[in-house]
């Protein structure tokens, strides 16, 4: 049996809710519970609190098993009532803990029940049906089906009864009481004349006699009533038995009327919506094509034919149409393999969506292990996912799975301490995450026969396309926050006000808090007023080169792009520093929410290192009165002893954050003087403008406070060195709270001038100097004094008008910052002090800092010296001194004296209310990549998508490295999907061209009456079925063997070249002769000499024989060269706003940039190197340059699947080009000989040719030297960039030949030592050194080469692999190719 491809799986233990005395309030085990996934939460409701193994799911069976279990147990409760729960629990997939929703005792709620269904939509849970206790006989209640429909508002935490179902006997639209049914959401009720409404589809189930129900009902969630005059049925027939047999509809289990029953234990159901924009239609008639279908997975009879197990029912304008089996990709070569992959008759199946894929989980017949299958709708291909866990095989037992769209994973829930039980018994203590595969969405034209995206529809233009949205969706369009968990489960519920978890904690509803945002952007009187919905789809058009659309809704993308491009400087409080020295300001809230756990760990380490260094400096003998005052002492002391804080009005505030600050604790502030407008102020992150105004106004009340002239804050002057004056310097009034005793000797600066500074002109963007070297700007970080403050990110700047883009990114403040870091009021690690150990040994409680190995370059996001984060929390006397030189054991720290201040006391701290000291928070993070790459990474963090203008190198490739090494899995999946699509398009192109070439060749042979051997195989036939099995989830052993064989052949060839000796002068002359005669036909002897010269040339460039040198040569990592001269310059806005230039310098810089861009366009320099993403995916045949880039990057990130695909593609490309050149040469020879022969002698020639062919086939063991035609045929036009068939391929220098793939052993070796070695430049391995081109041209090309480009070879000159260089140099006769290839 084939092996499944290993997947990125992870197993986690889950924390159960607190144990209660009543077992119905616990979540230990459940039977018949209902569950669903919404956003990043899994909800579980109801069920029995004991595990029962049910087989047929009938009421008599349930009662029998239950009472048998109770009678043999020692429980004192003997009735169902004591075991039937009605509680609602939810699992946070981020925090990995279960919680119970606590309601008031008197609030209405559904009755406890089991075998019911729940689903989630638009911040609400919906519950229907199930088995509940009857109320007719209170003495002996029994389980009966019910048909009541409930809604649970996640905002209000309140249950609402939508319909009690009492009139189902009078109204056919009301569903009858049922259990064991299914429930799903329909986004449009167009068949019921309510296309703008959405509703619930209640399917199947069993009645009170446990008989199957074939009636289905639909509930309108807008009008809150059932629709239709009669039940809806799922009809699995076309009316023609013959057609049903052909399509496979007769295979589905149904009743005699061909109605399908949907059962919880055998079926899965989901709705799929496809929106196709139609720009040519009038907007007032039909804004979009809204295609919705109900897809049902059901049991089949399996008569032997390979049919799909999914049937689709299209929701039409007037009715739900008959079923249609989803097409299945068929191929005669892999028919048996495909039949083994298709999941038939799964038990307890659940279905979900991921892009264009249907994710199906369930249990195969006679198996207790859960399985995961993925069906790709455009291609019709099934694949199976491998479920891997580091624990012992079979130690876990999972009962069900959910598709977690926003994180591209499948979630499995179960237990590790159970026996072999079915999904009827459910436990909740273990969670396993399985990464969903990234398939070739761009190769759909090859597999789906034209049903996929084509080249012209790769992008939706910024035109008049609109998305159709209903009223209810419009109500929640703008409820998208920056949090990643706001992504939703399906495309119709694309934006929620909060994550479901935060919604559950909200005390008041927020459903319509931002509905007014739908007002027109223009004036009410303007005839061209544009709604926000129209603007959203203009600013964030939907792209078709990626199917992962659930990361963020268009509204969040639009708001994020505006925040990044327009007000990114104003809301930023951290800077990302590139290897070019440029600084990109970014908000730490965005980094924490979008980057996630890895950044939080880095920030925690950096903060703890800063605190530890401060603690160390204090313990080394600093005076007691020079220590930082604690926040508690500041708040408890009187105003006469310690002055209060002083805040000033700041224009850099983000008004949209006011809602967040309303929930946070306010600070009581007072001030001695209202700050002057031109006095630089310190800034703290995320202070609300309204709060600043109130504080500023409130500060007037404290002007007359009696401070004896000592009105300086301890955070500004903790040592009470000098009183503050009204017009003091920026240093005196804005010192950091970390200034220690060695700063008190710095003399004060002179007062600022009394005259008012003119307002800063409102320029369109913010600028800083292009180079920070020798900068004498007063705000430059190179200044000797301000450099001390720059490392703390407290750079004083003057206040600017509100309209100015130069306004401060954070509110200004002078005074102690205790308790004011509202940004970091979220739960943060509770840490204990470090005694005698380096800061790196600190661990945090709330977050697992050991979750994977953090790269050494990232561990230093701290105050210490590092290559990743150059942050210094306390200015030292020797900035170059190492922290490790401090002897931690040379002094004894006094715990009592050290923890008398709240900053350093981490004991007994409430993580919910913990606030970090702003002056100790690291403010710069160095990322060792180029500015374009870092800026693109920030763009992804703000928008959640990949920009179509990203350069392939270095931007896209470097971001793949960032996502791998710095753990950004969503970005890795987005890039991988695009790269696999590019690989797939190239594969499909080559296979398509090979088929065309084969058809032309065979047509010519038939026209010339040349017989074709029935056993003959075309050279490219081995790849014909490759795309049929490439994404089936199984490991391609043939591909691994092929890669290993190619690597072995490559190494053998290189060793053979080393043993060849030659004369270097003779080599040079022959190379020169070969380069000057590249356009003429060489004689046979000249070709042989050229081959020898190439061997000698390779030998002269082979220095070391070590294995690592071989690897370095095989993997020419030229793409890591740090040469960025030809990269397009970034706008000044991408640089920090704290180093500024005059307007004249700004205009000059813009002119230089424009001139450079115009010159680049005119000259056409580096056009291939500057290929963008939209150009890459729009091409039918991506260049070999792009494939080489993907191959090298896959090597660095050790993505085995991508690496094998690219290596196979490179070998496929080389073989196809060699085959095409030889075949076209043979075709030219045949055509010429046919034209030169007289008509009477053709038959004789054909007879001789047949005899020659037979003699060649009989002597397979002996080598046959191909014959050479002595007559030169007429020249033929070159096809698809391939050289003329008469042009010898042997003239190409070997440096331009495509490199061969490597074996897995060498790849593993590279993975062990190349990850960080690759971050240095590899200038000695550039393939241009092997080129025979002119030296001046080569030097110019190297100067303008991208910093991360592998090769700059012309793909039209690429030839066959190294193993076939000599064989390709020999001319073949008419039938020589056939004989040689068959052998």
Swiss-Prot record:
Loss of function: phenotype: Results in attenuated keratomycosis.
GO BP: any one term: filamentous growth of a population of unicellular organisms in response to heat
Domain of life: Eukaryota
Subunit description: Interacts with SIT4.
Species: Candida albicans (strain SC5314 / ATCC MYA-2876)
Keyword ATP-binding among record annotations: no
Gene Ontology CC terms, in alphabetical order: cytosol
Protein purpose: Negatively regulates early sporulation-specific genes. TOR signaling pathway component that contributes to morphogenesis as a regulator of this key morphogenetic pathway. Required for growth and hyphal formation at pH 9, for full virulence in a mouse model of systemic infection and for biofilm formation. Involved in chlamydospore formation, distinctive morphological feature of the fungal pathogen C.albicans that can be induced to form in oxygen-limited environments and has been reported in clinical specimens.
Predominant subcellular localization, coarse grouping: cytoplasm
Protein name: Negative regulator of sporulation MDS3
Annotated signal peptide: none
Stretch list, region Disordered: 450-506, 625-644, 653-825, 858-884, 1063-1114, 1251-1289, 1321-1369
